[in-house]
Amino acid sequence: LVKLDADIKAIARSIIQGNEKRKKRIKNGQASAFDLQAAQVVGNALRGTCGNIESVRVRRQMQEKIYKSIVYNMPYEYIADALCGRRQFYEYRQEFIKRVASAMDMLPEQKGQEHGN
């Protein structure tokens, strides 16, 4: 994975961390256009992570642990039954953050790649 610039990573993490409040605003009918877009981006990015885990049940459990680790700022060591090693866990987390940043058009375009990759 390509390392994200600190500012891009911080903004993408903030988008993920705000997702629980965003869900409440959507549920209460008080959501902005950004709320709707960001909630969809976070959901799609999360579902796209951990693609190398074959079991759908295990993949969803891992995705939930990654999501909670970012939303509640919990390190790997505080997550019970992480289902993988520390390094793999943080690679999945980085993948999730990068997918959010990419979907929000926060990443610089790479030479030789089309927009949106």
Name what the model sees in each region:
Residues M74-E77, M104, P108:
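Short amphipathic alpha-helical interaction/hinge segments
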Residues F89-L107:
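DNA major-groove recognition helices of helix-turn-helix
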Residues L36, Q40, R60-E64, Q94:
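Non-catalytic, well-ordered alpha-helical scaffold segments
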Residues Y72-G85:
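Helix-turn-helix DNA-binding module
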Residues K3, G85-R86:
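Short, aromatic/basic-enriched loop-to-helix "N-cap" motif that marks the start
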Residues E54-M74:
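Short amphipathic alpha helix immediately N-terminal
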Residues L1-V56, L107-N117:
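N-terminal interaction/assembly modules
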Residues D7, I11, Q61-K65, Y92:
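Residue-level detector of well-ordered alpha-helical segments, enriched
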